[in-house]
């Protein structure tokens, strides 16, 4: 089967770039945005979403992978950092950056790309919450879209190939299959909304009812 995945070194590079630009962006946000609600995340604020963003690499480094991707696993990340300020969280993320960057090239495929896909999803979620549009053409978006293509190539849905072959931007493909587009938005970008809805129903995400522009 053809693989659509980005090369491991590109995946690792994309995560390092994502981490650095997200840290830089968040160091400058107004104090009243720290506890702003992040749309279509599990009732998380900006700060709590960052808890998850650093919690995933923390758990990887600690070998704490039991229940990986489940709500229990992700909520534990938020809980253990519940008393940390945003500045403290960003410092932690920065401090483990070099270590996780060296480890990512050793992640098996496609897990390495899925790791970037998740982080990229939440970077864009935060951007939407704080009104900081950007990084739509970032390397991490290419990596994320390629992970989606690889996922679709191996999917059992009889019309998954239709989504795979659709002419759509990397950003819209990544956000649509990441559960960050309403069905109307999915249709508007040229994808079959019924097929996307059925595929997303089998993923740990869901189709939003209110439009998300990032």
Indicate where each model-derived feature is located.
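Active-site-adjacent scaffolding segments
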Residues: 1-121
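Structured surface interface patches that mediate subunit assembly and partner/cofactor docking
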Residues: 2-11, 33-38, 42, 65-68, ...
């Amino acid at each position: 089967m053809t693989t659509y995945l980005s090369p491991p070194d590109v995946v690792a590079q994309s995560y390092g770039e994502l981490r650095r630009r997200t840290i830089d962006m968040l160091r400058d946000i107004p104090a009243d945005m720290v506890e702003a609600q992040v749309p279509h995340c599990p009732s998380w604020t900006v700060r709590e979403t960052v808890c998850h963003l650093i919690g995933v690499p923390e758990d990887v480094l600690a070998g704490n992978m039991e229940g990986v991707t489940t709500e229990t696993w992700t909520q534990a990340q938020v809980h253990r950092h519940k008393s940390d300020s945003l500045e403290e969280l960003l410092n932690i993320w920065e401090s483990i950056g070099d270590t996780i960057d060296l480890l990512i090239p050793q992640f098996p495929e496609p897990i390495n790309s899925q790791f970037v896909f998740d982080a990229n999803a939440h970077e864009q979620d935060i951007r939407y919450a704080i009104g900081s549009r950007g990084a739509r053409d970032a390397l991490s978006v290419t990596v994320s879209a390629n992970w989606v293509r690889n996922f679709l190539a191996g999917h059992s849905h009889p019309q998954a190939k239709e989504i795979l072959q659709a002419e759509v931007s990397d950003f819209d493909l990544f956000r649509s299959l990441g559960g960050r587009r309403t069905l109307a938005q999915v249709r508007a970008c040229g994808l079959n909304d019924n097929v996307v809805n059925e595929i997303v129903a089998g993923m740990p995400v869901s189709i939003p009812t209110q439009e998300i522009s990032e």
